[in-house]
Amino acid sequence: QVAQTDMLLSAPAEVQSVQRWVISSRDNRGAPFLMVDKPSAQAFVFDGSGQLLAVAPVLMGAAKGDQMLVPNAAPMSAIPTNKRITPAGRWWARLAPDAGGKEVLVIDHAAALSLHPIVKGQPHEDRAGRMATATPDDNRVSFGCVNAPVAFFSNAVSPVFADKMGVVYI
């Protein structure tokens, strides 16, 4: 309990404020929730009562912005870097298999937005290296999805969202 309180107290003020609002307004309807704080490039997993369970660095869309273009039939590699945005918003999310059968947290199916374990990507992207740095400044590299450490996804996201939907705030 003390470690969880310490984690929340060390979270950015905006994360603490949104957590208090979610609980006081019951916006999550008692469901677990996950917050992605874009400025700090971190994800925070909470249970339905607002207890902070886990925190991890994340990778986000290569471009800054809050609105994402809905993908069309073009391959992801055809999306220009300046359009690779992790959008801001609130969504009901659930675990589901991706096209390759791997479990992901589907945030917005229509926009192909999900939170998933870090992918290797192109060698020049050095996704694992970017996630390992202490600064969030280099954590913008994805096509828009949120990439999380494998252990964070397996030990926090997957069990918390198993068998139930939850809310994602970005």
Residue ranges and their predicted role:
Residues 1-34, 55, 63-69:
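Extracellular/luminal recognition modules and glycoprotein regions
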Residues 12-16, 21-24, 36-38, 70-73, ...:
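A short linear-motif detector with a strong N-terminal bias
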Residues 20, 41, 154-155:
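Solvent-exposed, polar/charged alpha-helical surfaces in well-ordered, non-transmembrane soluble domains
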Residues 39-114:
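Mid-length scaffold segments of soluble, non-membrane domains
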Residues 84-170:
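Exported/periplasmic cell-wall-interacting domains
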